[in-house]
Amino acid sequence: MSDRIEPKRYDETSPRYAGWRVVLACFLVALFLFGFGLYGHGVYVAELQRLRGWPAALISGASTLTFLLSNVFATFTSELIARFGPRRLILLGIAALAASTTLLAFAREPWQLYAAFILMSFGWIGMGTVVIATIVSFWFERRRGLAISLAFNGASLGGVVVAPILVLLVEEVGFSAAMLTATAIMVVILVPVVVAWIGPRPPSADPAERETQYSSSSQMPAAATDISRAIIVRQLAFWTISVPFALALVAQIGFIVHQIALLEPKIGRPGAGFAVALTTAMAVIGRLCLGMVVDRLNPRLVTAASLASQAAALLTITQTDNPTVLLAAGAVFGFSIGNLITLPPLIIHREFDAAAFAVVMGLSSAISGTVGALGPGLVGLVRSWSGGYAVPLAICITLELVAAVIVLCGGQKQHTIATV
């Protein structure tokens, strides 16, 4: 008798479907990764400056190095998933992130600081958006958009949950003890969840796809590591995904980083702080709302609409000092923030072979993430040159609109990528 499991259709709408436990696991992975690996950086800069007397430029340089390395390494995520399997790769990412935050707690020399942030970049590789999107996509077809949206909501909540808890712990027990305590909490929660819930996907009802599932113990298609990146970058569809999201991230990250400095003269520091909280909250709501309907929509059209709404919100901010209108504009901007993470994998799934997903996603994320990291610096430089935020915001609006036009230039044709 054959040991091969016969395929059947799984009800992705059922709460008992195992894929939803995978989504919850990925949600928690994103929460801790973005909490420690992104939103926690503000805590590290402030505390290490105070405790060690290091200049902000030194610490910020280490922080920037993390994002640059993680974006470069994201290109090779498909090979790592194929080599280690999703579960082991995430566990390695957790180990790297935990080692990073532990080293930060004991860092006394600049080289230790940089070693910690380099380790953090490996945490991003093992736990990042490409890995999460790939794992969730294993388990969902008809409800893929909702599943990815829910998983990525952990990224937004990382700023709402992890960063404030870090601040409170630092005030109570000091920076070193706070980092060790928070790291222990992360490991105790994530390791059992990942071990228990992230495993092989269920067998597909598609016979052709079923063959690829049994070709690798890591559950990656056998040809995933043979996909030609040279062929991918010659596809127009690839660039109509990567370029618009890169331009949009420049504008989005630039605005987010400078939001308090921009709004404080208009509505005061408490008002600016509330605006940031409102923007973050709307990012969570927006991703949830999108997830409910995106599986029935064209993700390119949704992307263009999201970018146009952000451009309109920024234009409104440049034209008024009214606190209510400014808060409303910030809410509109925030509503689509999270969607710029959710939408790329949905477009890629529609337009590229399933076997090429991790490769295309890794390449696209590397490009958009690296370019997007320039946003805060660009906005800051133009502000210093122009003496205000009117010109930087005009540039951001232009980038958003150009991105909206480019993303509409792509189509829904399925692109077959040759192997090497």
Task: Kindly label every feature range from the protein language model.
Residues 21-56, 73-77, 163, 254-260, ...:
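Extracytoplasmic
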Residues 41-45, 234-288:
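Extracytoplasmic gate region of multi-pass secondary transporters
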Residues 48-49, 80-81, 161, 165-173, ...:
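Interfacial helix-cap and linker-helix signal at transmembrane-aqueous boundaries
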Residues 95-108, 309-321:
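C-terminal ends and interior cores of transmembrane alpha-helices
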Residues 126-140, 339-352:
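Intracellular juxtamembrane helix-capping segments at the cytosolic ends
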Residues 155-202:
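Helix-loop-helix hairpin linking two adjacent transmembrane segments in secondary transporters
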Residues 279-283, 289, 294-347:
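C-terminal transmembrane helical hairpin of 12-TM major facilitator-type secondary transporters
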Residues 351-386:
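A late C-terminal transmembrane helix in Major Facilitator Superfamily
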